[in-house]
Amino acid sequence: MKPVCLIIGAGAGIGGNVAKKFASEGYHSYLCRRTDEEGLDKLINSITSKGGSASGSLINAIEDNSLEELILDIEKNIGPIEVVVYNLGAQTGMKSLDQTTHKEFEWGWKIASFGLFRVAKVLCPLMEDLSLIHI
């Protein structure tokens, strides 16, 4: 099994380029994004057509257990996750604090902060078992 680089928030910019780089270095790049399955497939094909190993799926990171189930599935069926790129952002626009609603702020927090916490909570013990990290 190849080590896995999990990219959560794999678009055409940073996430996609990180996926390409890790795949070129011998990793299996697993790409996730919330929408645009066609774009995701193009990104995966751009990696595999050059001999890299990649797969991916659409995921809504704020749904309960979505990230946790994804990580456990990858670990079981693809390989050990050695690298995670958490590249999600909440595009709520350039608003001042007084223009940002509570709902918009909460949504951004769920995506950016709470989602990363959930990833770390499930993945850190798995990485620690492989002596990849020390907590």
Predicted regions: what they are:
Residues 4-7, 84-85:
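Conserved hydrophobic beta-strands of the Rossmann-like cofactor-binding core
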Residues 11-13:
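Conserved glycine-rich cofactor-binding loop
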Residues 27-40:
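Conserved glycine-rich Rossmann-like NAD(P)H-binding loop of the short-chain dehydrogenase/reductase
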Residues 47-65:
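Rossmann-fold cofactor-recognition segment
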Residues 87-94:
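Conserved NAD(P)H cofactor-binding loop of Rossmann-fold oxidoreductase domains
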Residues 98-117:
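Catalytic Tyr-X3-Lys loop
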Residues 111-129:
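Amphipathic alpha-helical dimer-interface segment in Rossmann-like NAD(P)H-dependent oxidoreductases
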Residues 133-135:
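Conserved small/polar residues in nucleotide/adenosyl-binding loops
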